[in-house]
Regions:
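Short, well-structured N-terminal submotif of metal-dependent ribonuclease cores
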Residues: 1-40, 50-59
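Histidine- and aromatic-rich ligand-binding microenvironments
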Residues: 5-6, 39-42, 92-96, 115
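Residue-level signal for well-ordered alpha-helical scaffold segments within enzymatic catalytic domains
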Residues: 12, 47, 102-105
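Short C-terminal domain-edge/linker segments immediately following a structured domain
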Residues: 33-37, 68-73
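Amphipathic alpha-helical interface surfaces
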Residues: 44, 56-60, 95, 99
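Nucleic acid-processing catalytic cores of prokaryotic defense/repair systems
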Residues: 47-50, 80
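Active-site neighborhoods of divalent-metal-dependent phosphate/nucleic-acid chemistry enzymes
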Residues: 69-114
Length: 115
């Protein structure tokens, strides 16, 4: 199974400056035991690059290399955005909508998010 991780999961999962939540540890353990692949969406790099905490941003970006990226993810057009009733009032919305659209179009089987 291909599991897409939301940015709000990636940051605490890879932030070495805080104690890892047990649910995140369980996610990593079970995905490895069951041979599930954890993915990130390429647009999530934009989200992480906007992190105001420079040290955390540097750490998380360096650790993203351990995840597979969705190759050639579907890009949400303005028309599809309107048809699906999504709003994109800021950069975060754009990234979130494209992550959801990748799931919608079958680029991953499951999205893990804290939203």
């Amino acid at each position: 199974m291909n599991i897409l991780l939301d940015t709000n999961i990636i940051i605490p999962l890879e932030d070495t400056s805080r104690v890892l939540d047990s649910s995140f540890a369980e996610l990593r353990k079970l995905s490895a035991e069951q041979s599930h692949c954890l993915y990130i969406h390429p647009m999530q790099l934009e989200d992480i690059n906007r992190d105001k905490n420079q040290e955390r941003r540097k750490i998380v970006l360096s650790r993203l290399k351990q995840y597979s990226q969705i190759e050639n993810p579907p890009i949400l057009s303005d028309q599809e955005c309107n048809e699906l009733g999504l709003s994109q009032s800021n950069d975060n919305d754009k990234v979130d909508n494209n992550v959801l659209f990748a799931l919608y179009r079958g680029a991953a089987h499951l999205l893990v998010t804290n939203d």
